Amino acid sequence: MQPRRLVLLGIVALVSLSVVPVASQNASSTTTGAAGTSWTPPRTPDGHPDLQGIWDFRTVTPMERPKEFADKEVLTAEEAAEYERRMVASRDADANRDKEASRGIVNGTPVTEDVALAYNDFWWDRGTRVVGSRRTSLVSNPPDGRIPPLTPEAAKRLAARDVARERPAEGPEDRSVGERCILGFNSGPPMAPGGYNQNVQIVQAPGYVVIVNEMIHNARIVPLDDRPHGNLPQWVGTSRGRWEGDTLVVDTRNFLGETSLRGSSSSLHLIERFTRVDADTLLYEFTVDDPTTWTKPWTAQLPMVRTDDQIFEYACHEGNYGMTNLLLGARSVEKDAAAGGRKSSR
């Protein structure tokens, strides 16, 4: 991640020039705003709601409902303030520097410390507030706010993946797509809060919507002309959009198996819904359906807040020696193991 600066994406610049948002003079469709009041969204020249702008989806609200809230769906204002205070304190990387926390398996060895001291709290940008609805989880269905159980097939698949990650990496293909800077953490799809780079820019042009994620500077170009999905798997699948009233619906399938949302497979089918509910709020909802991974589909809601900030220029592998050193470390582990074997055979 590098200092904030304006990103000029060619495709975005081109489509931006062709769209001038206007407020509809005769719009008959209204949306229920965040405060429960009727609100008419501004519209683009082709008559659709104007979703354009940069939207911030930072929040401390977790994906799944914490057990401490049990059947509580919505927090009171006082409970939300206390939860925010606790979450901000617990995530302070400087204050919690000395606390051991598992960081997974690296080259076959469990890691419990940030030995490189790579990320102090300056670099994190997780957010400090719960979502505006004060829901206890982003998951809205099932009603318990929890992601459904894995299927037996998925449990075996994930266990095998964990075993494979315990051995030293033979090449970059053995590392995650995040470490390889192919896909990034919160950008999805579906989008979900993460550690930083939590903005998304939406640009509309006749027949297209472009979704530009700050993380990994990924841009999804979504056609709205009813074209078929085809059958070519891609990292972020193939997205096709349509309007249902004032809601933009994006249907995505044909994911590569390596993409993996929480252990999902290439059977993943994703439906995203974008609804502008007031001048400063874009309600983002997504439904995940993968019968080879979860026992039933699940849905999450993530209200996004309009921001006047610019998009970070995200740099991942430029000047990054982490992957090279990781693979060098793996070769060192193998060398030490081979030397130990020779000694024991004497």
Model-based region annotation:
Residues 2-346:
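PEST-like low-complexity, intrinsically disordered acidic/proline/serine-rich tracts
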